[in-house]
């Protein structure tokens, strides 16, 4: 049975404390991450090293990134979290020069756990709002 505390720990250790050791501990070898792309190519994240490449780019772009878990749910071996992401885009990463813009957007992560490690993840974050807040995407249609 999965545990909602896992999600709080994932976001606190991996994102708020920026711990790569936590990535190695909490993400299984061969874990598949849907909804995110490996910066080195590929339409998904596969394994800890692939995730670390993306994590490093995000942390470089948003050194003060903070993710707050708003809600969690558990369904068998799956745990989900609705989150709020805040930060300041001060780093040159993710394909754009720093804008010094603040972002505040939400998203959801659902993970499947095996032996207290993520083996599969589904990411649904509102990156359109993030890009709009940075002024690089207009949502006026």
List the predicted regions and their residue ranges.
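C-terminal and inter-domain tail/linker signature
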Residues: 1-141
């Amino acid at each position: 049975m999965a545990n909602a505390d896992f999600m709080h720990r994932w976001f606190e250790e991996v994102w708020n404390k920026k711990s790569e050791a936590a990535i190695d501990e909490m993400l299984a070898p061969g874990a598949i991450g849907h909804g995110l792309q490996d910066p080195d190519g590929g339409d998904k994240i596969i394994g800890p090293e692939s995730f670390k490449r993306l994590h490093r780019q995000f942390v470089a772009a948003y050194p003060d990134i903070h993710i707050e878990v708003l809600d969690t749910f558990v369904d068998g071996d799956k745990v989900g979290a609705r989150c709020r992401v805040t930060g300041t885009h001060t780093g040159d990463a993710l394909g754009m020069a720093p804008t010094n813009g603040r972002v505040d957007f939400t998203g959801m992560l659902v993970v499947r756990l095996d032996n207290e490690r993520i083996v599969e993840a589904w990411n649904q974050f509102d990156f359109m709002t993030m890009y709009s807040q940075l002024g690089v995407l207009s949502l006026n249609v």
